[in-house]
């Protein structure tokens, strides 16, 4: 018997009551994310006092202290109380209220919880038991990981009630439905997060029981073997990776290296020294025809693998569009493109076999050749991906399961190429994909964020990322409305629906665009010059959606400015919501103002003999504080807001490639201001106006 177990009779039997039996039950709506598997709410509550302490078993004090610290921080943030964290030796029969964090290896903990109806069977290494009443508050698990997850649930249970911080009386038995619940961050196409921000990502995700964090890398790791590839001013260094892995380990998060080994390698292959191994000159695909390709893969992973102690390596392999159109053309014509692809993946697996890791690969290309999937080693893990709001995803999971391969499903957080994430699409995509993955035996979920156009601000992704975490933990089809109902409390520690309402207002832009059948990515819409024929036509179409888009954005902004203080956790993410709202408003403004500018100028042009009318029309277009100035001003303002958002998360590297887009758009508006003022001066001198089309005013009312 371990010595640490000796304190348990004190904890479980001698603890003094902290509330009288007459105390009315709090019985709040729990609003927990993820939702536990089994929950019973009882009468009463455990009150946290200034004298309450957090007790961890002495034998596990080192490992379990991180869980205790997250709980102590939560209690301090909610109540101002600073609780001590102690082990068995500090217990010493002191009659004070105690929050006990225990391991189920102690038979007395197990027996006590069983006496309260909480069985320890079937919860595994990641599950936990949680019990509270007027006199007890206990979290117990088989492992430190399970205990950590139980504490994260406890943090959400704590509420203010009548000036006191309490935990409602509950019995909870909980465990994950999927072993691996992951999030991937694309750190290769533009923004590269700072080490501090990556730690923050991991810390927040761990609160919601995420245990896998993928770094999607194409060319951004500082490879000793390939010194030309990574941008030295921002490359991920071995020192940063070591720090990240060590930090994540304490939070039970495994860092997953995702280093491409086939496609998406343009930033390597654009250099002349790699021309021999490019499928097509300076292209994207590493050719399988050259042995040097495998030497490069071997060398890259020799640099990477020692830094990542987890069980997986993700070798990519998606979107190999050039394959068969360059050096592999003859081979593909001979044996078929599918065999060329799958033989390469097989050889990559063999090349990396000495590391004794399980290899993941993206499932889009191999899926085209289900009859050939037997070529792949059975220890590889397929990662099928799809980001649409489809009713079913079984068709892209089942072929891999039928071939005897393990599967991790990859939905998307809908952050890329968008002014603000399409939350409605993201929720449905994640819900259905994870549901079908569980049905077909997938071992996990890897919820993806991407940076296709290099603009995505990660802080906008939290709603869909947290929903993905919940869906992976919960069983079957997760309820979107229940998630929305819980999100204010579980993420912001806000007791009403303020931020749910703001998020739904932000999604009105996507809904308005869908109603007019515009499915162009909203970043592209934002950058369109409205004074070109193409841009004018698009603005004319968008004008029907603009009022709804702007009303949603402006209602969200009013609420965020008024109610920011309601966010008692993660308040800084409201700034990212604010940026998203202003970008929506600017897009709607551009659509509306383009219409109005065209209308006024055409009216002036068609009534050139009426000087007063012409003067009034031109005043609407380009006077001080008129519409063209408004478009320029909102663009330059957004440039500054975007810059600040970027630097909160990312290294300065690549930022200028986004800011130049703001500069170019603002410059176009400034040019139009100058041209319109010149037209006004011309009218004053000659009583004639430049034809509208020459100024870029193509929309004749």
Which residues are covered by each model-predicted region?
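Short secondary-structure boundary segments
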Residues: 103, 217, 449
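Contiguous, structured surface segment used for ligand recognition
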Residues: 21-181, 432, 455
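A generic structural motif
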Residues: 58-60, 189, 388
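Substrate-binding groove of N-acetylhexosamine-processing glycoside hydrolases
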Residues: 32-35, 40-42, 48-50, 123-126, ...
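Short helix/loop capping segments that flank catalytic or ligand/cofactor-binding pockets
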Residues: 8, 109, 147-150, 193, ...
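Feature activates predominantly on carbohydrate-active enzymes
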Residues: 74, 115-353, 360, 409-411, ...
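Bacterial N-terminal signal peptides that target proteins for export
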Residues: 1-9
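Bacterial N-terminal signal peptides
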Residues: 8-17
């Amino acid at each position: 018997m371990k010595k640490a177990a000796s304190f348990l009779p004190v904890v479980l039997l001698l603890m003094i009551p902290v509330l009288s039996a007459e105390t009315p039950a709090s019985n709040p709506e729990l609003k927990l994310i993820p939702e536990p598997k089994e929950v019973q709410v009882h009468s009463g509550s455990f009150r946290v006092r200034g004298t309450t302490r957090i007790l961890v078993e002495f034998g596990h004090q080192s490992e379990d202290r991180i869980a205790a610290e997250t709980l102590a921080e939560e209690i301090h943030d909610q109540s101002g109380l600073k609780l001590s964290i102690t082990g068995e030796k500090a217990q010493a029969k002191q009659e004070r209220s105690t929050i006990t964090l225990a391991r189920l290896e102690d038979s007395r903990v197990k027996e006590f919880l069983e006496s309260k109806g909480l069985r320890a069977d079937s919860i595994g290494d990641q599950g936990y038991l949680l019990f509270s009443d007027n006199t007890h508050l206990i979290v117990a698990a088989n492992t430190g990981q399970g205990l950590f997850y139980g504490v994260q649930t406890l943090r959400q249970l704590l509420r203010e009630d009548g000036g006191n911080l309490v935990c409602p009386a509950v019995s909870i038995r909980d465990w994950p439905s999927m072993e691996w619940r992951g999030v991937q961050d694309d750190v290769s196409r533009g923004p590269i997060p700072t080490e501090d921000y990556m730690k923050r990502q991991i810390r927040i995700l761990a609160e919601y029981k995420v245990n896998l964090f993928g770094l999607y890398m194409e060319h951004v790791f500082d490879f000793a073997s390939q010194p030309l590839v990574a941008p030295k001013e921002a490359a991920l260094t071995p020192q940063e990776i070591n720090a990240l892995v060590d930090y994540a380990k304490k939070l039970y998060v495994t860092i997953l290296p995702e280093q491409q080994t086939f496609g998406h390698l343009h930033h390597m292959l654009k250099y002349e020294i790699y021309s021999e191994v490019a499928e097509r000159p300076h292209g994207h695909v590493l050719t399988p025809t050259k042995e040097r390709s495998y030497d490069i893969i071997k060398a890259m992973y020799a640099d990477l693998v020692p830094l990542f102690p987890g069980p997986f390596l993700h070798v990519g392999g998606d979107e190999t569009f050039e394959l068969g159109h360059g050096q592999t053309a003859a081979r593909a014509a001979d044996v078929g493109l599918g065999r060329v692809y799958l033989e390469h993946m097989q050889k990559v697996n063999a090349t990396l076999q000495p590391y004794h890791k399980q290899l993941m690969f993206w499932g889009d290309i191999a899926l085209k050749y289900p009859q050939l999937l037997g070529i792949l080693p059975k220890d590889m893990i397929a990662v099928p991906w799809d980001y649409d709001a489809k009713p079913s995803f079984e068709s892209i999971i089942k072929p891999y399961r039928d071939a005897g391969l393990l599967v991790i499903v990859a939905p998307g957080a809908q952050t890329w190429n968008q002014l603000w994430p399409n939350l409605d699409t993201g929720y449905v995509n994640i819900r259905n994909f994870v549901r079908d993955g569980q049905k077909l035996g997938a071992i996990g979920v890897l919820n993806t964020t991407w940076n296709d156009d290099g603009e995505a601000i990660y802080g906008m992704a939290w709603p869909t990322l947290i929903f993905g975490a919940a869906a992976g933990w919960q069983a079957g089809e997760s309820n979107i409305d229940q998630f929305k109902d819980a999100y204010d409390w579980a993420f912001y520690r806000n007791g009403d629906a303020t931020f749910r309402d703001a998020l739904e207002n932000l999604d009105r832009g996507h809904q308005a665009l869908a109603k007019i059948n515009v499915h162009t990515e909203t970043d592209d819409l934002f950058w369109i010059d409205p004074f070109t024929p193409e841009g004018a036509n698009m603005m004319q179409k968008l004008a029907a959606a603009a009022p709804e888009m702007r009303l949603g954005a402006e209602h969200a902004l009013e609420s965020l400015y008024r109610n920011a203080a309601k966010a008692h956790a993660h308040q800084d993410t409201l700034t990212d919501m604010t940026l998203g709202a202003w970008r929506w408003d600017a897009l709607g403004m551009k659509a509306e103002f383009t219409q109005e500018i065209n209308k006024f100028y055409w009216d002036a042009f068609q009534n050139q003999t009426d000087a007063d009318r012409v003067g009034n029309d031109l005043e609407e277009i380009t006077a001080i504080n008129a519409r063209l100035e408004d478009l320029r001003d909102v663009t330059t303002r957004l440039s500054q807001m975007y810059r600040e958002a970027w630097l909160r998360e990312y290294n300065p590297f690549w930022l200028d490639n986004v800011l130049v887009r703001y500069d170019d758009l603002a410059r176009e508006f400034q040019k139009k201001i100058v041209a319109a003022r010149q037209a006004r001066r011309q009218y004053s001198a000659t009583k004639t106006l430049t034809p509208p089309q020459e100024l870029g005013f193509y929309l004749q009312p």
